[in-house]
Structures are given as structure tokens and as C-alpha cells.
Amino acid sequence: MRHRNRMNRLLCGALIAACALATGSGAAPAAADWRATVRQFAKEHFLNPAWGYSHCERDYALARSLAAADHVALDDDVLFAAAYLHDIAAFPPWGGDEPPDHSDVGADAVGKVLDGTGFPLGKLAAVRAAIRTHMYYRDPLAPEAVYLHDADALDWLGAIGVARISALVDPNGGDPDGPKAVRMLQDNLREVPARVVSPAGRALVGPRQAELQRYLKELGEESAEFRNL
């Protein structure tokens, strides 16, 4: 009996030591660690007012909300990584200078950012697929891709869509100026609504579409049909 108790104590000690080693500096990053790393990366590098860090946060939150409303289960690792990194190719050195399509360039580049963070690389292909189809004119397939796509599309409509485009206007008369910003909003109003595919996303299209329509109507009335912008 004493021998058995001694063996049990030794085994417990070995388990405690193993746990201590696992939490040491040589351990692989935990799930929370890779998410914190990715979030901090986006916060430091994605500074554009229209498609920077705050846009990533909105896309992630809205995609989760839409999926929950539709009772669709998502792989949150895939959604989180794709939402926070989907516009990476809009920023140098990962893209920046008018790449062929930032969705494709970003999908190819994202592995370099995730590698070494502790992200489960077996899910990298799904992240790439979601990034590749996040724009409203693309056709998403997997649930994570669908809800990121719809969240990103809806972020071009409503008051937030106005805020994003307005933030791009050059105050010194450069590109884009006020009239061009209006054309961008009109393009979004014309092209984006029909591309939202999920039931919960479709339910938000009408209110956001109407809000953007009202804004453009009132802005036109107050600016001689946009000539005095």
C-alpha cells in the first residue's frame, strides 16, 4: 500500500511538472494568444478609416450576429482570422499599390501572418477561402465565408457606409473629392444589396438601403444635386 501511495505521489508530481513546462516560455501559444496577436497586428497595421481595424471589428461582430440569427454554427477560429485579416492586401507591404484584386492577394499572403502565432494551420485553407470571397461581387461557399461576405457587404450600406466613404474624401480637393464620394455611395446602393445572401443579412438590407437612399436624397437637395460639394 505504501508503495502504491508513493507511486501515486510520483505520478502526480510528474503531471504537475508537465503542466508547469507546458505553460513555460517554450510552449506553443494558446488560442487566446494567437487571437490577441492577430488583433494587435490588425490594430497596428490597418489604419485606413474605411477598411482598417475598426472595419475588421465590425465585420467580425456582425458576421457572428447574422449567423446566430440564422442558427448557423461557424468555426470561430476561421471567422476571426478571416475577419481581422481580410483586407491585408490593401496595405503595404502585403499589397497596397492597386493589386489585381486585394481579395486574392490577401488570401495568398495571410499564411505568413498566421504562421507561428499558434493559429491551427489545418484551418488555413478555410481562412483563405473566406478572404478570397469576402467582397460583395464574389460568391462565398462555406458558412464562415458567407457570413463574412454579408457582413462586409452590409458595412457599405446605411450610416456606416456613408461614414466610411466620407472618411476617404481628401480635404484638399484630391482624389476622391466630394462628387466622387457621392458616386461611390451611389455605386454601393446600386450594386451591393442584391449580393447579400444569408436570411439574416437580407433582413438588414432594406433598412440600410433606405437609410443610404435618404442620405443621398437629402444631400442632393442641399447641394444643388451634388454640384456644390
Residue ranges and their predicted role:
Residues 2-14:
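Bacterial N-terminal signal peptides that target proteins for export
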Residues 24-32:
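Boundary at the C-terminal end of the N-terminal hydrophobic targeting segment
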